[in-house]
Amino acid sequence: MPAPLSVIIPTLQAAEDLPRCLASLMPGAEAGLIREVLLSDGGSRDATADIADAAGASIIQSERGRGKQLATGAKAARGEWLLFLHADTSLTRDWVERVRDHMANAPGKAAYFTPFKLCKPRRLMAALLLFKIS
């Protein structure tokens, strides 16, 4: 059975923050939880694509705009569960246990998980949303 989780990260000029974000996903990859990491990119001209490629993530070109990028990533995702994560956000160490617990105890229900760390705390836009595709 394939890993259940597709991680979708909308990006635009995210090279500075992306390495921390991707590194925070490693426990999930090591635990066999992550099926794929998809970067839905709105036209980055920095090293975003190179960083994603080096980490084994897939780049999907999208129209610019957070909603459009999230929708593009969701359409391309193959996982049973989707995790949306902003590039300037990194997950805390316990995220794998929290996600696994939710999947086991609340199948079919959307969830919003905290805490997370902002790479740039002055930005308050970061959010993490996890939901199951029916």
Regions found by a protein language model. Name each.
Residues 4-6, 36:
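Cell-envelope/extracellular polymer assembly enzymes that use nucleotide-activated donors
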Residues 13, 41-43, 64:
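Conserved short acidic donor-positioning loop in nucleotide-sugar-dependent glycosyltransferases
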Residues 13-29:
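Short, well-formed alpha-helical segments that are part of the catalytic scaffolds
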Residues 33-43:
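Short beta-strand/loop segment that forms part of the nucleotide-sugar
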Residues 41-49, 89:
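A conserved acidic beta->alpha catalytic loop
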Residues 61-77:
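Glycine-rich, basic loop-to-helix element that forms the pyrophosphate-binding segment
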Residues 82:
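Short aromatic/hydrophobic "clamp" motif used to bind/position activated sugar donors
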Residues 94-123:
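Conserved donor NDP-sugar-binding/catalytic core segment of glycosyltransferases
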